[in-house]
Amino acid sequence: MATVIDTLKARGSEDRAARHPEKQNRPDTPVLRKPEWLRVRAPGSGQYNETKGIVREHKLHTVCEEAACPNIGECWSQKHATMMIMGEICTRACAFCNVTTGLPTQLDPDEPRRVAEAVAKMGLKHVVITSVDRDDLLDGGARHFAEVVTSIRAAAPGTTIEILTPDFLRKDGAENVVIDSKPDVFNHNLETVPRLYLKIRPGARYYNSLRLLDRVKQRDPSQFTKSGLMVGLGETKEEVMQVMDDMRSAGVDFITIGQYLQPTRKHAAIDRFVTPEEFKAYEAIARAKGFLMVSSSPLTRSSHHAGEDFAKLQAARRALDARTA
């Protein structure tokens, strides 16, 4: 089966700079007007500009910008930023994602140092590190991911580290390199329900992602595991509940549930806007199923309030340990 990389190579170098070359020939889909509960202030505070300056100074990429996150104003104003490593070009072409698809450049061996330096300079108590998919690399970028974690530990020993990883599909043993770097939280998002994978996340496999989360717990039970789900793509309540059960069977500690927002007319269309009341209902269901931590709201994203949520996650584990002692 031809991949996005094969297609881009066949087209030549002129498409390398195109943000979404694989979506250019898709028909436009309507972009629905956001309801009141999804509207946020435009960014622009002093601390926002300071965060932006540090990111630029260290020549870093952030998923906040690349994925057009609606929470960027709030997070950057609090000097929180999610670093995106291994470049800004992804080898996948997920229908929901705003990150550029194309042929990536070589890994920058100095990136781990620069990321660690930025984390220390920002004085972060908790940092989230994510990446593009790098199917072009033999290990999917696992060693580079681990080097970033190790570098942060050295430069900012008091900072807790959360990673949001790709699935390392067909990269046997790659995830072990990342697990063994000892992040505090290992996050890998399932993103959507199995029925919608071919449409929404065609380069991935639902059960491969589920197995990845399970392998993290099997290899290092002390690490917190986390996974996220978008809603509003056409899934049913029953399907969402089944994903919750699947996550719990893999030992996932923390689930995030948020509204899918369509980046452009070429991306997957929003089926509907899930109401705040429905998100509260999902939160209650997830807690009843045994998750240590649940974040469920229209604007919930994997790294939104990650530091505060990590503290709550630790407290929840201590409380559970005390009850079962």
Swiss-Prot record:
Pathway(s) per entry: Protein modification; protein lipoylation via endogenous pathway; protein N(6)-(lipoyl)lysine from octanoyl-[acyl-carrier-protein]: step 2/2
InterPro entries in UniProt: Aldolase_TIM, Elp3/MiaA/NifB-like_rSAM, LIAS_N, Lipoyl_synth, rSAM
Entry coiled-coil feature ranges: none
Positions annotated to bind [4Fe-4S] cluster 1: 64, 69, 75, 303
Protein localization: Cytoplasm
Protein residues bound to [4Fe-4S] cluster 2: 90, 94, 97
GO molecular function, one term: 4 iron, 4 sulfur cluster binding
Catalytic activity: [[Fe-S] cluster scaffold protein carrying a second [4Fe-4S](2+) cluster] + N(6)-octanoyl-L-lysyl-[protein] + 2 oxidized [2Fe-2S]-[ferredoxin] + 2 S-adenosyl-L-methionine + 4 H(+) = [[Fe-S] cluster scaffold protein] + N(6)-[(R)-dihydrolipoyl]-L-lysyl-[protein] + 4 Fe(3+) + 2 hydrogen sulfide + 2 5'-deoxyadenosine + 2 L-methionine + 2 reduced [2Fe-2S]-[ferredoxin]
Co-factor(s): [4Fe-4S] cluster
GO cellular component, one term: cytoplasm
Biased composition (Basic and acidic residues): 8-33
Domain of life: Bacteria
Domain Radical SAM core, first and last residues per copy: 76-292
NCBIfam families: lipA, PRK05481.1, PRK12928.1
UniProt family annotation: Belongs to the radical SAM superfamily. Lipoyl synthase family.
Protein name according to UniProt: Lipoyl synthase
Species in which this protein is naturally found: Caulobacter vibrioides (strain NA1000 / CB15N)
Gene this chain is encoded by: lipA
